[in-house]
Regions:
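Extended, well-ordered protein cores
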Residues: 1-262, 271-493, 497-509, 513-519, ...
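C-terminal, helix-dominated tail/subdomain
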Residues: 699-720
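Extended, solvent-exposed regions of the mature portions of secreted/cell-surface glycoproteins
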Residues: 689-704, 731-733
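Membrane-interacting alpha-helical segments
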Residues: 669-672, 696
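C-terminal accessory extensions/subdomains outside the catalytic/core fold
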Residues: 713-733
């Protein structure tokens, strides 16, 4: 099962999937596709608005069910975690293509509007991964990738001991400080209730199931303390003359983080929001969508010039803002989904701890990460680099990750239990008998969040950690903080469940995240590997932080999800869907997306298939694909990022070329050898011609009939421009 997703990986699929299908056919393997793109998920949710021929199935729900089957084998490419502005763009594009879907209601007042808004909420943020991830995560850099990075090290900015770059976080009133956590002894249910100062109660979440042994947490971030913290950090950034930047995860944490982002925008531009409060209310300015929302709503208004000048003045008076795009004047505060912590912090650390200012110059930076829970890992890395200099990709070790994520574990499953509070009072989490399990005092504007972590995934996670430590003969560190309520519950379980496994001769420790970061970095510089065993958020952060420093990108990681019922989910790298790549392709016919993640995932997918179904041909495809990938890296056939040189389509040709050669050379399967020998010969004889045809297609604007929902035929034509290559491939079908 191969997923159709969004942006650059979607384009790449149009070129690579025909190769995969052609090579799989002689091994009696059928590749099916399911469309889980943002547009596909929107259409699947609104069948009642569509004509019969426009309706499509709900592929995500279907794949979610498949993930619980023992024979599941899913190759999952990155997809958009949609912010509200992206969702609106996708809706407008689909409407323009003749799909009569409704608009996203700004304020849902009628029942119909509430239903529409709830349906759209299902496709916002990281809506795909929690559905498919019915297992924990095993992510590591494959040997071929690590060897390539050592031989061809990526650039690393030099560090200075007197760098002023640092992380700033709250010291009170954040999620970390207010967290309460309990382990539920028997199965039951819970409700979340708000009780006002006047004693009136309101149900925030109706009865929902709890499993025996489940860990539940509640935490609050105080809006007033957040705003006071931001105001003091703005003054500090100005005094220290460093860039001001904010690092959140507004895509995945789709309820809490846009609210935090909006509060930060309001404090930074406090004078403007105070002066134009009435106007902004009339215009429906929503700071959850960032500063960009002010510019969008004021456009064409008689007061546009005045408001824009006020914003400019505020920027001139405040500390310099880190920029997303200096040329276009897009700041860190424009769009919540533009700066995503797991990608932005490693990029900053790799760039000497600096971000870009309005003039496009690299400057020392204050990185605001409001909640303390994980901010320390980045500060520890910065401190280490200030003391020891930049890490060296030629010699550094690796930090593979075993991540707890099955069944929406921890914060990444909290969206349906996260609320902004509208008045002072108390939020109570009660069991079915009305007993209060946890309560939190709250004030207007505070964000309350509850998380759940089921016991079976924790047991599976501990088992996976022990297996990886044993198989790779590497120390494994559980990143858990004894001073944090949730982690204390986890430490108890981890300590208990480790006793169920033979850990003789294994080096397994529990450390808080800061100590674990320093321990891992001290080993990295000696060229030693250390497995990080972490919760769901740290899984996300660490599988970007270390790969970006080690191999230059997280897209080259092997990302395996051994599903708890025996199937396999193979994710193609940990990077996103690269919007800048598709923009460049549409403008000038050059796609710089690197499909290495797809090659690696496909290799382990074939291997899993071969082992589960005893399909020897699948095992041969897996082994030869790995050989081809290694040769592909050795010969440097990844996209060159320059028009007139190899791009994504050319890289696919070379992978197919080397794969056919490996299949022709192998001796384990005579039938495959006989089929691929003439194919390898034809590709060898036509190498120059195919390259010419592929490069000739570059340098021109491309019409693929859409961004979120492109036309299949137009995209296929744009992504498969070599008639010679297509003709040779067709012989396998």
């Amino acid at each position: 099962m191969y997923t159709i997703t969004d942006e650059a990986p979607m384009l790449a699929t149009h070129s690579f999937l025909p190769i995969v299908k052609a090579f799989s056919k002689p091994a009696n393997i059928t590749i099916e596709t399911r469309d889980i793109s943002l547009a596909g998920r929107i259409l699947a949710n609104f069948p009642e608005y569509l004509k019969e021929e426009q309706k499509i199935g709900d592929a995500l729900t279907e794949l979610g069910q498949l993930a619980t089957a023992p024979d599941a084998n899913i190759v999952k490419l990155p997809n958009i975690s949609a912010s509200v502005p992206q969702l609106k763009e996708a809706i407008a594009e689909l409407q323009a293509q003749g799909y009569a879907i409704p608009n996203l209601p700004e304020e849902a007042t009628t029942e119909e509007e509430k239903t529409i808004k709830a349906k759209y909420a299902k496709v916002l943020g990281s809506a795909v991964n929690p559905v498919l991830r019915e297992g924990n995560s095993d992510r590591r850099a494959p040997k071929a990738v690590k060897n390539y990075a050592k031989a061809h090290p990526h650039s690393m900015g030099a560090w200075s001991a007197d760098s002023k770059s640092h992380v700033a976080h709250m010291n009170e009133g954040d999620f970390y400080g207010t967290e309460k956590s309990v382990t539920v002894s028997e199965a039951g249910s819970f409700t979340i209730e708000f009780e006002g100062k006047n004693g009136e109660t309101k149900i925030l979440k109706a009865a929902s199931p709890l499993k025996a042994g489940e860990i539940i947490d509640s935490a609050v971030i105080s809006l007033s303390k957040l705003k006071a913290f931001i105001a003091s950090e703005i003054a500090d950034a100005k005094a220290k003359n460093v860039l001001f930047s904010v690092h959140l995860k507004a895509t995945m944490m789709k309820v809490s983080d846009p609210l935090l982002f909006g509060a930060i925008v309001e404090v930074f531009f406090a004078d403007v929001f105070e002066k134009y409060a009435t106007l902004f209310q009339e215009l429906g300015v929503d700071t959850k969508n960032g500063l960009g929302d002010v510019y969008a709503k004021i456009a064409g208004h008689p007061m546009q010039a005045e408001v824009e000048q006020a914003l400019t003045t505020a920027m001139e008076n405040g500390p310099a803002l880190a920029m997303v795009n200096s040329e276009k004047g897009i700041t860190n505060l424009h769009v919540p989904s533009d700066v995503i912590i797991d990608a932005s912090m490693p990029a900053m650390i790799r760039n000497s701890g600096q971000m870009w200012d309005a003039a496009g110059k690299s400057q020392d930076t204050k990185a605001i990460i409001p909640d303390r829970s994980y901010a320390g890992i980045y500060q520890a890395t910065i401190d280490f680099c200030k003391k020891n200099g930049a890490l060296d990709p030629k010699t550094m070790g690796s930090v593979p990750n075993v991540g707890l994520m099955a069944q929406k574990a921890e914060e990444y499953g909290s969206h349906d239990k996260t609320f902004q509070i509208t008045e002072n009072g108390t939020v109570k989490v009660k069991d079915a008998n009305g007993t209060v399990l946890m309560e939190q005092a709250v004030e207007t504007g505070d964000i309350f969040r509850m998380c759940q972590t089921k016991d079976a995934p924790i047991q599976d996670w501990v088992k996976l950690a022990v297996n990886r430590a044993r198989l790779s003969n590497t120390p494994a560190i559980f990143w858990l903080d004894e001073n944090r309520a949730h982690d204390r519950q986890l430490i108890e379980k981890v300590t208990t469940y480790l006793k169920n496994h033979d850990t003789t001769g294994l080096d397994i420790h529990i450390m808080n995240p800061v100590d674990a970061t320093l321990f891992s970095l001290e080993r990295i510089v000696k060229g030693l590997d250390t497995i990080s065993v972490s919760g769901n958020v740290l899984r996300d952060y660490l599988t970007d932080l270390f790969p970006i420093l080690e191999v230059g990108t997280s897209a080259k990681m092997l990302s395996i999800v051994p599903l708890m019922n025996g199937g396999g989910l193979f994710e193609t790298g940990a990077g996103g869907s690269a919007p800048k790549h598709i923009e460049q392709f549409i403008e000038e016919g050059y796609l710089r997306w690197d499909s290495l993640g797809e090659f690696l995932a496909l290799g382990v997918s074939y291997e899993h298939l071969g082992q589960v179904f005893n399909n020897q041909k699948a095992l041969v495809l897996s082994e030869t694909l790995d050989e081809a990938t290694e040769k592909f890296l050795e010969n440097d056939k990844s996209p060159a990022r320059k028009i007139g040189q190899i791009d994504n389509r050319g890289s696919h040709f070379y992978l197919a070329f080397y794969w056919a050669q490996a299949l022709a050379k192998q001796t384990k399967d005579a039938e495959l050898k006989a089929i691929f020998t003439p194919i390898a010969e034809e590709l060898t004889n036509n190498e120059a011609k195919i390259n010419e045809e592929l490069i000739a297609a570059q340098g021109k604007a491309q019409n693929i009939g859409g961004y979120y929902h492109p036309n299949f035929e137009l995209t296929e034509k744009a992504m498969r421009p070599s008639i010679t290559f297509n003709t040779i491939l067709a012989k396998l079908n």
